[in-house]
Amino acid sequence: MKVYSLIIGVILSGFYSSFAQDNKAVAVVSATSCEAICKANTSKKALLLQSIANKSNENKTKSTDGMVWVAAGEFKMGTTDYPDAQPVHDVSVKGFWMDQHEVTNAQFEAFVKATNYVTIAERPLNPEDYPGVPVENLVPGSAVFSPPTDKVSLGNIQQWWKYVPGANWKHPSGPESTIVGFENNPVVQISYLDAQAYAKWAGKRLPTEAEWEFAARAGRAHTKYYWGQDLKPDGKWVANIFQGTFPNNNTAEDGFVGAAPVQSFPKNPYGIYDLEGNVWEWCSDLYRDDYYKNTTKVNPQGPLDSYDPEESGVEKHVQRGGSYLCSDEYCIRYVAGSRGKGETTSACNHLGFRCVKDAE
């Protein structure tokens, strides 16, 4: 049951608490990179998602167009920089196909046109979930990064995150925004359930956390960043992350204030783009902060249940890669091996996904 504090003109919560300041990379990050501030009525979600996903077609199911083959291999997974990514441990994965880039607005639009799918952020809110909240305030929407004009303390994320009625994948920053002209940008305002529905329709699936990190490391040593030891190798930005003073002054030294069109930065040795920065990406694994202490080493699929000690009782899935809002002074989640987490129905304007596919 939701509480009244979720909606006070805008809907607020402990949302995005993993953006709490990382004074040191080893600091305990307080919560998720993209927590829900608004939960749509999903009581029928299982049946709805299944009916949508079943509209996949045979040709799409068999196609690996736009994907890269990632051969089986072993690697060291995790990082000592964050408690929930420890211990660093040996993992092996079988070969799989991975989307060369994040799912774009154009690709997601094709899915919606084919299936009439309605994302979580677009669905009406159930008054029963928000007792005491006036019905007129229960307007579908989502979380939008809204930077303050001046420098602020980093202790209160509500200074730069706002619930915006009408924000969804077609209108990422609110009703006045559009994806027209941004068809090649990664689709955002996507919940785990939305990503899962698209993946099944496309004859694919979401990557496991192990597959995602294996592809991001791309055979490279256990470096600080996926691309190497230096934040700016040879003085060049190689990922879309935040430069300047967070959250009010993004100097956009890498050429982008928000999300960049896919393939704007160099591909990794496996031929895959934007596995670090740009937008967070959903993985199939449920999130547990202690999972690495008990995980299997061969093709790990994630824990059987979700548990976050900072928000027990809330089902969360793993997110990976960081986004254009991660900087070297705040939310350094482009550090190789680091993890994010998000409530299953959460969405925001720096969260997207890509898909993988098993070998035939």
Language-model-derived ranges and their functions:
Residues M1, D22-N23, S43-K44, A239, ...:
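Generic cytosolic/nucleocytoplasmic N-terminal low-complexity/intrinsically disordered segments
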Residues I7-G14:
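Bacterial N-terminal signal peptides
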Residues W69-V70, K76, P124-A336, T344-A347:
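Functional-site microenvironments in short loops/helix caps that host divalent-cation chemistry
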Residues V3-Y4, S18-E176, L193, A218, ...:
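Short, compositionally biased
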